[in-house]
């Protein structure tokens, strides 16, 4: 039964990703570029590392684990070690990087929003991508969210990432950046919703 469930979920995931790729071709090309770069870095036995837009250093910790089984009279205990001296887990480095990079962008947006809210004397709280303030300040928070978002994404983030990697991994030749889309970020400031 477990085999059938794995097969079915893999099939559904593949179909979903294919449809998403058709609907959001630019995003798919960017995700593919991120994965290709991660594959290149991992092929040299290096963990994928980068700086978030606010300067936080990020290193993916995925390494092959080493298991030890301890047999006792009461039970068998399996201990797993994933120390820094172990080789990287290449597949996890590749598959985890695109979403991890996006999370670093999201967290940068959250931090920059919190700083701007504080600068304006407004309360702010957040969990993951859910942002809160007092009901009387929601309209102002929506303005701040959009201003910070457009300021962040007006930066050439992929170019910055590639330049950083070219310095960090000088022996690697990274593929050309994906083509930029046509979204006018200024429209986000006036849209009722971020995505329509």
Predicted regions and their residues:
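Conserved catalytic core of nucleotide polymerization and phosphodiester-bond processing enzymes
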Residues: 1-196
């Amino acid at each position: 039964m477990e085999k059938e469930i794995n097969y079915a979920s893999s099939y559904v995931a593949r179909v979903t990703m294919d449809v998403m790729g058709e609907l959001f071709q630019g995003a798919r090309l960017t995700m593919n570029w991120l994965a290709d770069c991660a594959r290149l870095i991992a092929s040299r036995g290096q963990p994928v590392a980068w700086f978030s837009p606010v300067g936080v250093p990020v290193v993916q910790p995925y390494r092959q684990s080493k298991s030890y089984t301890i047999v006792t009279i009461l039970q068998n205990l399996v201990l797993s070690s994933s120390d820094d001296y172990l080789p990287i887990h290449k597949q996890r480095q590749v598959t985890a990087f695109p979403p991890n990079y996006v999370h670093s962008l999201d967290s940068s947006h959250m931090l920059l929003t919190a700083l701007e809210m504080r600068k304006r004397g407004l309360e702010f709280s957040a969990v993951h991508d859910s942002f809160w303030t007092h009901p009387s300040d929601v309209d102002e928070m929506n303005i701040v969210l959009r201003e910070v978002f457009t300021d962040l994404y007006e930066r050439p983030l992929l170019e910055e990432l590639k330049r950083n990697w070219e310095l960090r991994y000088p022996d690697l030749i990274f593929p050309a950046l994906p083509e930029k889309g046509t979204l006018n970020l200024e429209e986000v400031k006036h849209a009722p919703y971020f995505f329509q």
